[in-house]
Amino acid sequence: MIELAERHSFKLPAQCRALIELKSSDDVEQLAFEEPYYLLGEGSNTLFVDDFYGTVICNRLLGVCIEEQESSYLITAAAGENWHNFVADLRARSIDGLENLALVPGSVGAAPVQNVGAYGVEVSTFIEQVTAWDIKEKCWVSMNKEACQFAYRDSVFKQHPGRWLITSVVFRLPKDWQPVTHYAPLNQLQGHVSAQKIFDTVVEVRQKKLPDPKVIPNAGSFFKNPVINKAQLDGLLQKWPDMVYFPVADNHVKVAAGWLIEHLGLKSAFVGDAAVNPHQALVLINKAQATGSDITQLALKIMKQVADASGIMLEPEVRLVGQHGLVQLAVEK
């Protein structure tokens, strides 16, 4: 068995039967993909809550190609590239559009899976194509934006885990850059708002709000911000007039899950060494030697109390992996 604690940012004690590091796309077709298997990037959105009785395939594909076109840049990035370093390198080259997503943990290949988003920007806005190995059909596929079926923190890759091994992502970034600053604290920036100012502000805020996983093991935002309809919103605002929410399309709003957790007095909640981060309630942390059981019990405790108080069922944004694959958490309403 192979240790996995250093392979995921929450550093839970777990092992796997076998581990493969993929460093060349030429090797993809030779992989057996014997079940159970799990496709892993940098492990910043994965928690191994138990020993995994299968093979972990770590994507270590590297390389970035930039093609300048008349009105945009076409950038092809290998899936194993570190996301923040990729964004920072583009910013240094004055290729902008992804600056709101600075310091989002993980790899380039994980970005379309989660459709990562922050401060008003989702990565799907800029994705032109995803190249992947179709494990089921045993063939290469190039998937455009529509085929990826992007939604809020969702995609076809997340809906069908283990079906595709992403090897590269193509981004199109327009030269006619427009700042996105309608989310706090970016909406408080004064004077000329440059891409560098947005990048620096996002990095500063994230470093203040989110613990460094190298110091305090965590996986960033543990829960999604739930989306509810206006009728549900009206009912909750009668109960909690100061509840934090953001409008989204089609008569729906997005509720701040961190506000719900903190408002219900769960900011000091813990089970064993798993705890709610005192500075950002949406983040759960490993204080020292948390176990998979600690974190799942804490998550279920939070989900149940939020559901009982609001009727909202929080969904984990992170992926929980147990003995045979993904584990789904759910509580009775």
UniProtKB/Swiss-Prot annotation:
Cofactor(s) this protein requires: FAD
Q: In which pathway does it act?
A: Cell wall biogenesis; peptidoglycan biosynthesis
- What is a single cellular component term in the Gene Ontology annotation? cytosol
Query: Signal sequence span per UniProt?
Result: none
What reaction does this catalyse?
Answer: UDP-N-acetyl-alpha-D-muramate + NADP(+) = UDP-N-acetyl-3-O-(1-carboxyvinyl)-alpha-D-glucosamine + NADPH + H(+)
UniProt keyword list: Cell cycle, Cell division, Cell shape, Cell wall biogenesis/degradation, Cytoplasm, FAD, Flavoprotein, NADP, Oxidoreductase, Peptidoglycan synthesis
Q: List the molecular function annotations (GO) for this entry.
A: FAD binding; UDP-N-acetylmuramate dehydrogenase activity
Q: What class of enzyme is it?
A: oxidoreductase
Q: Where's it found, cell-wise? A: Cytoplasm
Q: Which Pfam families match?
A: FAD_binding_4, MurB_C
**Enzyme Commission no:** 1.3.1.98
Give residue ranges for domain FAD-binding PCMH-type. Answer: 12-176
| GO BP | cell division; cell wall organization; peptidoglycan biosynthetic process; regulation of cell shape
Instruction: Name the catalytic site residues.
Output: R153, S221, E317
| Function text | Cell wall formation.
Q: Its family? A: Belongs to the MurB family.
Protein name, UniProt field: UDP-N-acetylenolpyruvoylglucosamine reductase
Instruction: Supply the source organism for this entry.
Output: Idiomarina loihiensis (strain ATCC BAA-735 / DSM 15497 / L2-TR)
